[in-house]
Amino acid sequence: MMELTIAQAPPTSPGTMSEPEGQKKPYDYQERYRHVRQKPLSVYSVEVKGDERTRPGLFAKVLDPVYRATTLDELRVRCVEANAVLNSYDIFDRVDVEMDAGPREHPDSAKVTVEVSEKKKLSLKGGAYVSQQGEGSMEVSVGLNNALGYAEKLDVEFIKGHERSSSYTLAWNQPRVGNVDVDVVTRAFQQVSCSKRLSSFDETARGISVTAVGGGPATVDYSLVWREIADPTRLASKSVRHQLGHSLKSSVSYTYQVDERDRPVRPQAGYLARVRSELAGVGWDTQMTKFLKHEAEIQAAHTPAEGVTFFASAKVGAMMPLGQNAKD
C-alpha cells in the first residue's frame, strides 16, 4: 500500500473569478505530479513505526536507496521497491509507505514514513496422516518467526509413525542473505523410514543440508547424509542385502521448477514441471556413495465441473554409478 501526498490544491487568488458553487473543477493531482515529478528534492527523514522485534539494521539496508533519491519520481520508485522488499521477508502482516512534504524550513525536501505490522512470533501446527505405505503418523511442528529480529524463521518438526518410521527436523531459514534476493535454508535432520511391508528393510538417515533459493525457479542444494540400511526381518532381497550397513553421501543438486498450480496440495488447476540433477560423491572420502542422477516430473490438474477434478502426473529418471560403485 502506497500513499503519495504532493501538495494541497492552491487557493483561489483574489483577482480570479471563482466558479459557481457546486461546479468547481476537481483539482488534478496527476497533472500536478507530472509537472513536478522531475523537480530536484532531498529526503529529509525516513521514519519506521511498528518495529517491535525487527532490528533497525534490516530497515537501514532496505531503505538506504530511499535516502539517495534526487527527484520526486525517483523517490516514488524507491519507495515502491522498498515496500516490495519488506513484504518479501514474510515477517509483516502489513507494510505501508507514505511520502509527504518536508518541514517548511527545508524547502524541496520530503519525509518518508514506513509503518509495519509484524506477524506473530510463535506458530504451532499438528495433524494425523496416512502415508502411501499405509502407515499412520502424527505430525507436530513449532515455528518461531523473527524472534531475534533478523527476519529469520526457525522450525522444529516431529513426525512419528505407528510403526518404526519417524522424522525430526530443525530448519533455519534466513531470507535475503547479503540484502540480495537469495534465501538460505539450513536443516539438520534424522529420518527413519520403515519399508518392512513392501521391501523388508529399514533406512535411517542423519545429516545436514543447505539450500539456496533465488527469486527465480532454480534452487541449489548441498547435503551431507549418513545412511544406515538394516534388515530386521531377515527377508530382504539380495539387492537390498548388498546395500546393508552404513554409507556416507555428500551431494550437490540443482532443481529447476515451474509451478503454475492453484495450490500445492490437491490442486484443481494448473501444472507443475520439475527437473532435478544430483551429483553425489563430492568430497575427499573415496568410500562415499558416488553417482549422477537426473529426474524429470510433470503434473497437471483440470476441473471441468464443480466437484470433478482430473489429475495426471508422470516422473522419469536415470542414475549412473560413478567411481568404485560403477565397477561393482
What are the residue ranges of the model-derived segments?
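Periplasmic POTRA and POTRA-like interaction domains that precede
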Residues: 2-74, 99-145, 179-183, 271
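Basic phosphate/pyrophosphate-binding loop/patch that engages nucleotide-derived ligands
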Residues: 6, 213, 304
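Short beta-strands and strand-coil junctions in structured, solvent-facing domains, enriched
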Residues: 53-54, 68-69, 121-123, 148-149, ...
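C-terminal outer-membrane beta-barrel translocator/porin domains of Gram-negative envelope proteins
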Residues: 238-245, 249-328
